């Protein structure tokens, strides 16, 4: 959530920055609410001052034994007016808060201006795509003989789910272990095990609610109380960013404890609303997928340096696996709702002859921290908002896809990347099932 003072100081400048990311701010509606808020606040303050003055008069009149009934009647009338004004002011404040929750973050000045993904800017490219001397197969065809099973997953659950068997399941586990070991032992992250369901307050804190509710899987439950039963919703996490970032919700962290670096491996659950017809074949876009997530909580002055570091931490996994990739900076029109700057890592997918996203690394600035009231205190100073960052380190399923395609052999086998072999008991090749 943005600081409402930015809107009060120069709403036109804010509107212009938001327009670069395709968001049209209703300036007139905001200004109308602000004008009424100011008028009500002024009226309330004047009425309170008048009531206080009259209350003193009542005391003086009674002290002299004089009739104070007329003044008391006026105080009663002021009380009724104040009550109505306070109720209307609460309505306006709630409406403003609702508006603020729906407004995306402001893009950082270093972010290229653009309308969509075609205007993202490549920052660097690492590794050269392999030149095959046989017809390249996609990961579905390669995996079919190695234990990648969509049919059974459809029978058990439905579309956009998959099952892994044997060596392929072991490789999936090995990838998770490699990622966690790298981030904890080399990059200084603390491994966390987190709930896979969170409450609505956590989803609001990181920005999934209220805007993206249709993308979430909701788990309603009945909660009993003295007033009877009510329905309370849990949500399956779309990313471990949600529980990890909410660790600091409603907290004041001592400045000397920052930065905080958390890493977690979790399944992620997404309804993929609005994705009908996209990536229907294979593991690229699923309702459930594994991901190793990186989250950092840092002082404001360090967040953009931290973004470069976090992006490098995600890149390190691709380098260890020797997978060709490129890093791009997203333009204003392609950034996520809460981000002020984002780098995407895209891995080479031979069967598609293109790079596909495998990690998104974002600096959220104080956008999430303001929603969560996540603050730090340096020494004896006043509490101030922290900055939060997150990134995939990496999406496990898409990493598996990249290995199946980039390391495939003409005989249907897949070479195990050298970095994974210690996690797979020295196995160097996955052979097709007979």
Swiss-Prot record:
GO terms for cellular component: cytoplasm. Its EC number is 6.1.1.11. ATP binds at residues 270-272, 357-360. The keyword Kinase does not apply. GO terms for molecular function: ATP binding; serine-tRNA ligase activity. Disulfide bonds: none annotated. Pathway: Aminoacyl-tRNA biosynthesis; selenocysteinyl-tRNA(Sec) biosynthesis; L-seryl-tRNA(Sec) from L-serine and tRNA(Sec): step 1/1. GO terms for biological process: selenocysteine biosynthetic process; seryl-tRNA aminoacylation. PROSITE patterns: AA_TRNA_LIGASE_II. Belongs to the class-II aminoacyl-tRNA synthetase family. Type-1 seryl-tRNA synthetase subfamily. HAMAP family: Ser_tRNA_synth_type1. Consists of two distinct domains, a catalytic core and a N-terminal extension that is involved in tRNA binding. Homodimer. The tRNA molecule binds across the dimer. This is Serine--tRNA ligase. It comes from Cupriavidus necator (strain ATCC 17699 / DSM 428 / KCTC 22496 / NCIMB 10442 / H16 / Stanier 337) (Ralstonia eutropha). The gene is serS.
